[in-house]
Amino acid sequence: MFKFNNKALISVFSIFFLINLVFADPTDGCEMDTNTLFITSTGDVFYNSDVDMGGFQFDVDGATVNGASGGDAGAAGFTVSAGGSTVLGFSFSGATISAGCGTLTQLSLNGDATGLSGIVVSDPTGNSVPFTYYVDSGDDGGVVEGCTDE
């Protein structure tokens, strides 16, 4: 017979919980670094921007995009089109998505998205704004092992 040790069981669950907290995906764009995009497993594309956005384009890695709708792009009246793995969002009327954070758009996917690449974001005058894909480093500001910088 196997005998359960409650303390050991609680310790194991605590370790899994802490690992999940450290490496968990963001639940909204406000948790992310500035000027980043992130795609969730359900196809929500989060953003965090310090400038108003006049348009965006990116490729979805690992999946085919069947469609795009909603989010702050939809609320701003953007036309968001998807073809293959590429998503393009802009406004015919010159509308913008205000600086801030949230859900940029919601994608219908075929396959499992592993990230976004080829990210291009423009401000309202068409100038390119440097954006990257958000990757949580899990860095808590502590000491980096093997680092000897003073």
Predicted feature locations:
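Primarily marks secretory-pathway-exposed extracellular/lumenal segments that are disulfide-
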Residues: 2-150
